Amino acid sequence: MAPARENVSLFFKLYCLTVMTLVAAAYTVALRYTRTTAEELYFSTTAVCITEVIKLLISVGLLAKETGSLGRFKASLSENVLGSPKELAKLSVPSLVYAVQNNMAFLALSNLDAAVYQVTYQLKIPCTALCTVLMLNRTLSKLQWISVFMLCGGVTLVQWKPAQATKVVVAQNPLLGFGAIAIAVLCSGFAGVYFEKVLKSSDTSLWVRNIQMYLSGIVVTLAGTYLSDGAEIQEKGFFYGYTYYVWFVIFLASVGGLYTSVVVKYTDNIMKGFSAAAAIVLSTIASVLLFGLQITLSFALGALLVCVSIYLYGLPRQDTTSIQQEATSKERIIGV
């Protein structure tokens, strides 16, 4: 059970960020491996749907542990889930956006190298920064804005001449991959800040909020699954192409999603940047060892700029873990 937000220790924050980093790096490499080695390619949409189901089941179990008794557990579900259609509707917004993001992420990674995907995905930082300013009434310092533009420059270098794998040859469509990652980035920025605002605007349990979001998420992803792959699924089956590696990827995605909600609840979206920077390094090293990735100079410089910008962005001059209620338009855009 996660501690109360007021009593969160530095160790707990570091623990969550460390686990989130390792899971993100492992997920990127493992997903890339399944997409390049599978003899029969599975449906990525079904994997996203199953991920939502697993996250829901884990959240239900954690809520039961948090409440401590069957009676309080039933009362909590009845009050906050079954008896709160308004709250379910509120949490359906990020679940819908996250569903789109997850599907776009699967599509992007199928058409991009693992390291390119991981670095390019960091465009969610400037998108998140803008959403934070507009939605949470926070201010960003000039140094933070500089780091945002530095990040854009780094990602541009990565896209200009991306690294190429030499040992694994896979038919890819980079244009489709970058288009999918752009949509995923926009979804990530909005949904992350929206969910943070919902979590920190009330004392409702984190696991209750997760259950509310994942319930609608299952409906959304299941509908999306049959809209995009319905005919093939009926012909080949829902679990077509599934292997132990695919289930491992789904498990990593589920754990990563849960830890992301914990990090957002007890720190903020800015702290997620540190995790992303470390994941870039780890996934790149893994790609070199496993896929024979050749790092070009432009890719290396771009990755370096991304890591430095994420570090600078994570050095705010103010407390960014709580929502400010008052801020002028000028302060929100420029900051001090």
Swiss-Prot record:
**One Gene Ontology cellular component annotation held by this UniProt entry:** membrane
Instruction: State the compartments where it is located.
Output: Golgi apparatus membrane
Residue ranges annotated as coiled coil are none
Positions in the Cytoplasmic compartment: 1-9, 65-87, 136-141, 197-209, 263-269, 316-336
Q: Which UniProt keywords apply?
A: Antiport, Golgi apparatus, Membrane, Sugar transport, Transmembrane, Transmembrane helix, Transport
Q: Which residues bind CMP-N-acetyl-beta-neuraminate?
A: 55, 101-102, 117-124, 188, 210-214, 272
Q: What is its membrane topology?
A: Multi-pass membrane protein
Where are the residues of the annotated region Disordered?
A: 316-336
Q: Which GO terms describe its molecular function?
A: antiporter activity; CMP-N-acetylneuraminate transmembrane transporter activity
Lumenal side residue ranges read 31-45, 109-114, 161-175, 229-243, 289-296
One GO biological process term: N-acetylneuraminate metabolic process
Expressed, tissue-wise, as follows:
Ubiquitous. Found in all the tissues examined including skeletal muscle, brain, heart, liver, kidney and spleen.
**What is the recorded phenotype of mutating M20S?**
No effect on CDP-ribitol and CMP-sialic acid transport activity
Could you list the residue ranges that cross the membrane?
A: 10-30, 46-64, 88-108, 115-135, 142-160, 176-196, 210-228, 244-262, 270-288, 297-315
Q: Any keyword Transmembrane?
A: yes
Alphabetical list of Pfam families matching this protein: Nuc_sug_transp (PF04142)
Q: Does the keyword field hold Transferase?
A: no
Family, per entry: Belongs to the nucleotide-sugar transporter family. SLC35A subfamily.
Q: Main role?
A: Transports CMP-sialic acid from the cytosol into the Golgi apparatus, functioning as an antiporter that exchanges CMP-sialic acid for CMP. Binds both CMP-sialic acid and free CMP, but has higher affinity for free CMP. Also able to exchange CMP-sialic acid for AMP and UMP. Also mediates the transport of CDP-ribitol.
Its subunit composition reads: Monomer.
Task: Report the protein name in the record.
Answer: CMP-sialic acid transporter
